[in-house]
Amino acid sequence: ASPAYIREAGEPDTPQSLVNFRCINRCFPSGEKYRWEFISPSGEPSEVSVRGDLVVDSDTAMIQAAESGLGIAFVYQSLVTQQLSAGSLVRLLPDYHYPADHFCVYYPSRKHIPVPLRAFITWVMAQNKSILSE
């Protein structure tokens, strides 16, 4: 969220309290809105259906909307490093994190994995570790 939005609305103290704030929603191609996912400091997962009239379909649009003070965004921290450093965005709920390890790479068979596919899988795993370490 932008500092201006935080001054106006305050800060949430838990993911569940996000329902009391104007959030920027993300829409899947199906039209369904994304439920924000969190892991608590104690390791408990939770999901929140946030409120807000603005619905976007890209990280770029979500970041721009948040910088403009239109609400709270939910994006990977690595995508907003510059904005956080510059002070145009403020990180909220620092004790909670996104369960980024919950994704899969599907491929036909483990018996004969082509070298390019093996390289891709290795790269995806490395990217995931990088995101989780932030």
What are these regions (language model features)?
Residues 1-26:
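Flexible hinge/capping segments at coil-to-helix
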Residues 14-16, 27-28, 45-46, 81, ...:
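Short secondary-structure boundary/capping segments
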Residues 3-5, 28, 41-42, 109-111:
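Short loop segments at secondary-structure junctions
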Residues 22-42:
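Secondary-structure junction motif
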